[in-house]
Amino acid sequence: LKLPRSILMVTLSDVDTGAPKAIMSANLLSAMRTGAMPAMSAKYLARKDSRVLSLIGPGVINKCALMCYMEVLPHIEKIKLRGSSVNSRTALAMKEFIEEKYPQVKEIEICSTLREACEDADVVSEAMSVTKENMEEFHLEWLKKGATVFSMGSFLYRQFDDFLGTKMVVDNYGMYEKYMNNFIARGPVDAFGNKREWVI
């Protein structure tokens, strides 16, 4: 049917009467909000001299995130893309978008594996939309020291349990509560014996 992954709606109502003034799609609004959140976080959490950005899942969410990242991470000069394959239509479309909109980016690499996409990245932005069976396993050793990971999609959160260390940052505790149950069920410390700390 060529439908988007989610179909969202918003109603604009008269502030005095409550009468609806517009009922319309909220997909773009949701994508921009979802993309803006990690970029706002990157402003405070990512290295100020970040030069390599990795977009895992080059669809609409990471496209919106990219536009926001480029506002707060002005030194980005290389972008790595990981789609479903090196011939992914969304990855190729994202590459063209970057070439047209961000001429300051000197290199754009479409990666064949998740590992390749994560290695040497200062910021990893994940917004995959895949089934659990098709998720690639994520490993700590792929990340460089000081890298920041933003996950908005389908990373298996238990895969982060051994290396996130002491802190996870979320924008809405209730929204992520089910995801965090994976950690809470394993106790208050990670595999290294570090106490988990949640920042909201």
What are these regions (language model features)?
Residues 1-33, 37-39, 46-49, 200:
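N-terminal ligand-binding/catalytic initiation module
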Residues 33-54, 60-72:
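Short internal alpha-helix immediately C-terminal to a glycine-rich phosphate-binding loop
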Residues 106-116, 169:
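Short acidic-hydrophobic, aromatic-tinged amphipathic segments that line or gate anion-handling sites
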Residues 72-74, 138-145, 160-164:
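Short, conserved loop/helix-junction motifs that constitute active-site signature segments
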Residues 72-102:
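NAD(P)-binding Rossmann-fold cofactor-contacting core
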Residues 119-120, 131-148:
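Rossmann-fold NAD(P) dinucleotide-binding segment
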Residues 161-200:
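Adenosine-phosphate binding glycine-rich loop
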Residues 128-130, 153-154, 173:
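Short glycine-/small-residue-rich Rossmann-like dinucleotide-binding loops
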